[in-house]
UniProtKB/Swiss-Prot annotation:
Gene name tied to this protein: mcmbp
GO cellular component: nucleus
Keyword Protein biosynthesis annotated: no
Similarity comment: Belongs to the MCMBP family.
Organism encoding this protein: Xenopus tropicalis (Western clawed frog)
UniProt keywords, alphabetically: Cell cycle, Cell division, DNA replication, Mitosis, Nucleus
Stated role: Associated component of the mcm complex that acts as a regulator of DNA replication. Binds to the MCM complex during late S phase and promotes the disassembly of the mcm complex from chromatin, thereby acting as a key regulator of pre-replication complex (pre-RC) unloading from replicated DNA. Can dissociate the mcm complex without addition of ATP; probably acts by destabilizing interactions of each individual subunits of the mcm complex. Required for sister chromatid cohesion.
Subunit structure of this chain's protein: Interacts with the mcm complex: associates with the mcm3-7 complex which lacks mcm2, while it does not interact with the mcm complex when mcm2 is present (mcm2-7 complex).
An MF annotation (GO) of this entry: chromatin binding
Name of the protein in question: Mini-chromosome maintenance complex-binding protein
């Protein structure tokens, strides 16, 4: 790192300077730290220079350097106390020095200094710990885009070797007598945990097998982290997607301290200490496997699309981005419709509805009713799952996060869909439906065969139905269920009408049937230029974020038109039809870049719905004739 990047390579040095320049008792230094790093990170190039834990191996990162991490809050632990400011006494000269404990897991002092636990100048503070995992189902193109934007300079290092760590501390330590210096082992009691009463102990890396990192989806990779949050933690909740900038802590002392606890635990009655030990294993895994990040700046992400500005409101740059894209939106929509029509074997009507589904999102809740959701059931799909899985690969190229769920009897009976509270470990055990907002979930019902659902299977199917209907998942807290609202785009592919509820049912009518589906769709994706796919990704991501409104005049026109429709066909037009028409009209308007309802888009919605219903009636008639 160059001198100009010392705020990245040695953020604790920056904090020390601001701490020393202020009266620690008044707390202004803490605000100054946040302001300093926030100002640095407002510059996009500076932010891109911070190494990212998502795409950088942990052993490439220097301990106590500034890192960033894009993640989902999987669990929130109980608040913990730590020594925000503590005083040491020099055993040789009796000189007293104040140190900061914020952004650290262990208290730092020089060899001849000892912490005075009874000092009146000590300040006990509180912080919150989030257990965070990489965004579940984050698509490869998103990871690649973020990686390509990174300007961080990292090289391999032996981050966990004590000798290397000691050298790093000594190189950076000359500026002030109270700077960081490594301990030489547990023989010297110079490094104390900064947590006050009830301090957490950490398990050694040699303990049993590698811990379960609690990822919601099977097969996920990437680091899990314990995020230490110091301010505003009540602004965040479970399943939020965050971008965290903070100080990386992989201190070997965290594991070394735990070895003492393991030795003590071995002398106790195992039955008495089992629950406590299990909780420590869950809350304090080895830092080499689950590093700690002490946050300085934490941002809740409005979306996880690297092609869009972080927010569409506020800056002139964002407004210009939106304006420029809207000017070419019509052409992009036409190309996307053609692309999806090919993916759906030439069915342009199904492609229209798939576009509406992809741009849908829950934008508000009225009592218990989620507004904006548009679960699509695409029936008539070729049986055996090949088509559905290939369609998922297409969707995966367009949205930031997605997951494919084969709805087999075995999966329904064996997979854990619903997160549950483990009271022994005092943690939330993840389930498959613990997903970040705006994740696309493709449920492949074409693989469903005759069989018996057990109790778990029934609960899982019920959970899927509640997710689709109410956009909520009832987490299992043993003694009660707790509702967690969600915002998941569910696409159900089926042979006949799905067993699951949906907002819209479209029967697929292929205009072609290639002899080799995999080769056909593979060629379609290969022929799509990255620049074109990026336009599709921007289109879908942007339209999810646009506001929409209906004027009083348009509302009156819709009401009058609906009354007329009921007069002409009272048997087949219901309140549900009006609701669906309004949803389709809203999404159709947004798909054309219009943020208010026009007569043209209302008529367009009516036309689409009429075509969809006619097709369903024809299919029903064909099925009856086949009986």
């Amino acid at each position: 790192m160059t001198g100009g990047e010392s705020w990245i390579s040695d953020p604790l040095g920056v904090v020390q300077g601001l701490f020393a320049a202020q009266r620690p008792a008044d707390g202004d230094w803490q605000k100054n730290v946040t302001d300093y790093f926030s100002a640095k990170l407002r510059d996009s190039d500076s932010a891109a220079a911070v190494p990212c834990l998502n795409d950088t191996p942990l052993h490439y990162l220097k301990p106590n350097s500034l890192v960033r991490f894009r993640c989902m809050v999987q669990d929130m632990f109980d608040p913990e106390f730590y020594m925000g400011v503590y005083e040491t006494v020099d055993t040789n000269t009796s000189a007293r020095v104040l140190h900061f404990g914020k952004y650290r897991d262990v208290a730092e002092s020089l060899p001849q200094q000892e912490v005075d636990p009874d000092s009146r100048r000590n300040v006990t503070c509180e912080r919150q710990t989030f257990y965070c995992v990489p965004v579940p189902g984050e698509c490869p193109w998103v990871k690649d885009a973020y990686t390509s934007c990174s300007q961080a300079k990292v090289c391999a290092s032996t981050s966990y070797a004590p000798s290397r760590q000691k050298r790093s501390y000594e190189e950076d330590e000359d500026a002030a007598p109270c700077d960081t210096r490594a301990s030489h082992g547990l023989g010297e009691p110079k490094r104390l945990e900064t947590e006050a009463a009830g301090a957490q102990q950490h398990l050694p890396s040699s303990c049993s097998s590698a811990p379960d990192l609690n990822f919601p989806l099977p097969g996920e990779k990437g680091p899990a982290c314990l995020i230490k949050v110091y301010e505003g933690w009540d602004l965040f909740k479970v399943n939020d997607v965050l971008e965290v900038y903070g100080i990386l802590s992989v201190d070997p002392a965290l594991s070394a301290l735990t070895e003492d606890r393991e030795a003590v635990s071995a002398l106790l009655d195992p039955s008495d200490d089992m629950d406590t030990l299990e909780e420590h294993r869950a809350h304090c895994p080895p830092a080499s496997l689950v590093p700690r990040i002490h946050t300085i700046v934490t941002r809740k992400l409005q979306h996880n699309n690297p092609l869009l500005p972080p927010s569409l409101q506020g800056s002139e740059e964002s407004k210009l981005f939106v304006s420029n894209f809207l000017s070419e939106l019509s052409a992009v929509r036409a190309e996307l419709l053609d692309f999806l029509s090919h993916a759906l074997l030439g069915d342009s009507l199904a492609a229209e509805y798939l576009i509406l589904h992809l741009i849908s999102t829950v934008y508000a809740r009225r009592d218990v009713l989620p507004l904006g959701k548009f679960t699509l059931n695409l029936s008539g799909c070729p049986r055996n799952g090949t088509f559905s899985e290939l369609l998922y690969r297409v969707v995966q190229q367009l949205v930031p996060a997605a997951h494919y769920l084969p709805m087999t009897i075995e999966n329904m009976n064996k997979l854990c869909f619903i997160p549950r509270k483990d009271y022994n470990a005092n943690r939330l055990v993840s389930g498959l439906l613990q997903l970040s907002p705006q994740t696309s979930l493709l449920v492949d019902e074409t693989l469903l065969e005759q069989g018996q659902l057990d109790t778990t299977g029934v609960h899982n199917v019920t959970a899927l139905g509640n997710l689709i209907t109410w956009q909520k998942v009832d987490y299992d807290f043993s003694y009660h269920r707790m509702e967690f609202p969600c915002n998941i785009n569910v696409l159900v592919t089926s042979e006949g009408r799905s067993l699951l509820p949906s907002d819209c049912h479209v029967h697929l009518q292929p205009q072609m049937m290639p002899p080799n589906l995999e080769q056909y769709l593979g060629a379609l994706l290969a022929a799509s230029l990255p620049s074109l796919l990026n336009k599709f990704r921007t289109y879908i991501g942007l339209l999810r974020l646009l506001d929409y409104s209906i004027s009083d005049e348009a509302t009156k026109a819709v009401e009058d038109d609906f009354v007329e429709m009921r007069k002409n066909d009272p048997q087949s037009i219901s309140a549900d039809d009006l609701h669906r028409l309004l949803v389709v009209a809203r999404l159709s308007s947004l798909s054309a870049g219009q943020t208010s309802l026009s007569r043209e888009q209302w008529l367009r919605a009516k036309q689409l719905e009429q075509q969809r219903k006619n097709r369903l009636r024809e299919q029903k008639h064909m099925n009856v004739n086949e009986l």
